[in-house]
């Protein structure tokens, strides 16, 4: 059976996009990925909707695909101690909390008292309220005060601080611990940096990749997620 003209057009669309140099993360592909990813609890959807409705820079939220990825990674790692740097409105902490083992807990760091209070309201309504500890203040101070070891770390905060956060947590990472870092593609602009944020993120990626203490993979999931563990 031969395909109709319309069918051929649909079949060739992805390759045509690639030949034209269009970015992979188109709206259509994003929608397809969303539709084929297991959704998280309704409370997280409510959190996301309220974040977009009431806060500035709502795009900083991790979102359902990265949230499900974090849930899966935490479920596989079965961490006793999770460290999150950058609570924002609590979406990613809630996503990770759902994958914790019975003895697992999360310490999440947020500089803004207002955002921390917003997130706490959702934590209190969740089944994991007693397992999420919000620390308000500079994240480096919190990391310094914690003994570790960290079994899972999620970094999604001020991009200028990424290298400092990385250096602070690597010595406190458990032997099988994993670090996940969000936004490491920075909209694709790390490939050919133009502004300061581009250069900061590109420098962070170079720093991690050159670090002989660790090994990493940069995944092209949404805005880029880098997974890191100790080498050897």
Residue locations for each model-derived region?
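A short alpha-helical cap/connector motif
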Residues: 1-152, 159-180, 184-232
